[in-house]
Amino acid sequence: MTLTIGLTGGIASGKSTVSAMMRELGLPVIDADEAARAVVRPGEDAYRQIVAAFGPGILQTNGEIDRAKLGAIVFNNEEERKKLNAIVHPAVRQKMLAEKEALVRSGTKTVVLDIPLLFESGLTSWVDKVLVVYVDDDIQLRRLMERNGFTEEEARARICAQWPLAEKMKRADAVINNNGTREETRRQLLAILKQWDALEK
């Protein structure tokens, strides 16, 4: 029986760090952001639908979708954003589920689904255990400003667009506190995975 772990957190909470640690431990990680990039590549169904919906003006000279141009169209326009999400979200879900099913069929002991918006997208039914990566608000804000070059106002707006981390923690099966060092984070991760019997013997 395969154990499916849903890995999530807040923006700049250190989820990617934990995801990388899980890969290092030999766990297969299916990443929602990677899937979202894959489904909009030239030749994919979602790519064709996006070009049909938004016109060839969103393409770069090499035929790939210009994410900045598309982003500018959908960022401040709720209707356009809904139109894009209605194309991309089902394609991403289909891709992730297909990858998960293939791993389950091959008898993999544990599969990790790395989904930033696990709760917001209502996908908790996909997983057996939810692992939330947490940091204090001030650290989250500082990391986001440093990492993305955001002003404090921009960083706060990005954080507020997601569920509060405190709410995610309440619904989690386990929480990793990522305020400290990488080693402290790794220790917590190992303890949780051992408790869940998630690692190959």
From Swiss-Prot:
Keyword set includes Transferase: yes
EC number: 2.7.1.24
Binding site for ATP: 12-17
A cellular component term, taken from the record's GO annotations: cytoplasm
Disulfide-bond pairs as recorded: none
InterPro entries: Depp_CoAkinase, P-loop_NTPase
Keywords, alphabetical: ATP-binding, Coenzyme A biosynthesis, Cytoplasm, Kinase, Nucleotide-binding, Transferase
GO molecular function per UniProt: ATP binding; dephospho-CoA kinase activity
GO process terms (BP): coenzyme A biosynthetic process
Major localization listed first in the record, in broad terms: cytoplasm
Compartments (UniProt record): Cytoplasm
Superkingdom of the source species: Bacteria
PROSITE patterns: DPCK (PS51219)
Family the entry assigns: Belongs to the CoaE family.
Classification via HAMAP family: Dephospho_CoA_kinase
Name under which the protein is recorded: Dephospho-CoA kinase
Native species: Geobacillus kaustophilus (strain HTA426)
